[in-house]
C-alpha cells in the first residue's frame, strides 16, 4: 500500500467522519430549532391564554363595578324617594289643626298621664299649641304647661319628682310607625 493510498484512505475516512459529524450536527440543529419553535409556540400560547384571562378578569371587574355602581344609584334614588315621602307625611302631620289636632293632643296626653301618679307635671308642646295645651292641661290636676319644644305637635310630659319623661310628640309617633312599617312602605313604593 502506498503512502498516497493511505493518505487517501485517511482523507476519505476524515471526510466520511466530517460528513457524519455535519449530518449529526444538522440533525441536532434541526432538533434544537424544532424544540425552540415548540417552546416559542408554547410561550405564545401561554401569553395568549394569560392575556385572555386578564381581559376576562378586567371585564368581570368592570362589570361587577358597574353593577355595584348601578345598585348604589338605585338605593340612593330609593332613599331619596323615601325621604320625600317621609317629609310629605311630616308636612301633613304638621298641618293637622282644629278639632283633629286637639283630639290627637288630648289622646297623647291621656296616654302619657298614666305614667304619673299625683306628681307635679309639666307638659311641653309645639310653641303654636300653647293655648291648646293650656285648655287641655286645665282638665288635669297638678299639670301645667312648660316651655315649648321643637316638635310637630303632641306632648312631652315630665316630672322632676319621679324623673319620668314621656315623649308623645307627633314626631316620635311618626318615627315609630315609620320604622315599624318601612319595609312595607318600601315594598309598596317600589312594587317589590
From Swiss-Prot:
<dbReference type="InterPro" id="IPR002842">
    <property type="entry name" value="ATPase_V1_Esu"/>
</dbReference>
<comment type="subunit">
    <text>Has multiple subunits with at least A(3), B(3), C, D, E, F, H, I and proteolipid K(x).</text>
</comment>
<comment type="similarity">
    <text>Belongs to the V-ATPase E subunit family.</text>
</comment>
<keyword id="KW-0472">Membrane</keyword>
<keyword id="KW-1003">Cell membrane</keyword>
<keyword id="KW-0813">Transport</keyword>
<dbReference type="GO" id="GO:0046933">
    <property type="term" value="F:proton-transporting ATP synthase activity, rotational mechanism"/>
</dbReference>
<dbReference type="GO" id="GO:0046961">
    <property type="term" value="F:proton-transporting ATPase activity, rotational mechanism"/>
</dbReference>
<feature type="region of interest" description="Disordered">
    <location>
        <begin position="1"/>
        <end position="66"/>
    </location>
</feature>
<feature type="compositionally biased region" description="Basic and acidic residues">
    <location>
        <begin position="8"/>
        <end position="26"/>
    </location>
</feature>
<keyword id="KW-0066">ATP synthesis</keyword>
<keyword id="KW-0406">Ion transport</keyword>
<comment type="function">
    <text>Component of the A-type ATP synthase that produces ATP from ADP in the presence of a proton gradient across the membrane.</text>
</comment>
<dbReference type="GO" id="GO:0005524">
    <property type="term" value="F:ATP binding"/>
</dbReference>
<feature type="compositionally biased region" description="Basic and acidic residues">
    <location>
        <begin position="50"/>
        <end position="66"/>
    </location>
</feature>
<dbReference type="GO" id="GO:0042777">
    <property type="term" value="P:proton motive force-driven plasma membrane ATP synthesis"/>
</dbReference>
<feature type="compositionally biased region" description="Acidic residues">
    <location>
        <begin position="27"/>
        <end position="49"/>
    </location>
</feature>
<dbReference type="InterPro" id="IPR038495">
    <property type="entry name" value="ATPase_E_C"/>
</dbReference>
<dbReference type="Pfam" id="PF01991">
    <property type="entry name" value="vATP-synt_E"/>
</dbReference>
<keyword id="KW-0375">Hydrogen ion transport</keyword>
<dbReference type="GO" id="GO:0005886">
    <property type="term" value="C:plasma membrane"/>
</dbReference>
<protein>
    <recommendedName>
        <fullName>A-type ATP synthase subunit E</fullName>
    </recommendedName>
</protein>
<dbReference type="GO" id="GO:0033178">
    <property type="term" value="C:proton-transporting two-sector ATPase complex, catalytic domain"/>
</dbReference>
Amino acid at each position: 500500500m502506498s503512502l498516497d493510498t493511505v493518505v487517501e484512505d485517511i482523507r476519505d475516512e476524515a471526510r466520511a467522519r466530517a460528513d457524519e459529524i455535519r449530518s449529526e450536527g444538522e440533525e441536532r440543529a434541526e432538533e434544537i430549532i424544532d424544540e425552540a419553535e415548540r417552546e416559542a409556540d408554547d410561550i405564545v400560547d401561554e401569553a395568549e391564554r394569560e392575556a385572555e384571562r386578564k381581559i376576562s378578569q378586567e371585564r368581570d371587574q368592570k362589570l361587577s363595578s358597574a353593577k355595584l355602581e348601578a345598585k348604589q344609584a338605585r338605593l340612593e334614588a330609593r332613599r331619596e324617594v323615601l325621604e320625600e315621602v317621609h317629609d310629605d307625611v311630616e308636612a301633613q302631620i304638621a298641618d293637622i289643626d282644629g278639632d283633629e289636632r286637639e283630639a290627637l293632643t288630648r289622646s297623647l296626653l291621656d296616654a302619657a298621664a298614666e305614667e304619673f301618679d299625683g306628681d307635679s307635671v309639666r307638659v311641653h308642646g309645639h310653641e303654636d299649641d300653647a293655648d291648646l295645651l293650656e285648655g287641655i292641661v286645665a282638665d288635669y290636676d297638678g299639670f301645667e304647661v312648660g316651655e315649648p319644644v321643637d316638635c310637630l305637635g303632641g306632648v312631652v310630659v315630665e316630672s322632676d319628682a319621679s324623673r319620668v319623661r314621656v315623649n308623645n310628640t307627633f314626631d316620635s309617633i311618626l318615627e315609630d310607625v315609620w320604622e315599624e312599617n318601612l319595609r312595607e312602605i318600601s315594598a309598596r313604593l317600589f312594587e317589590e
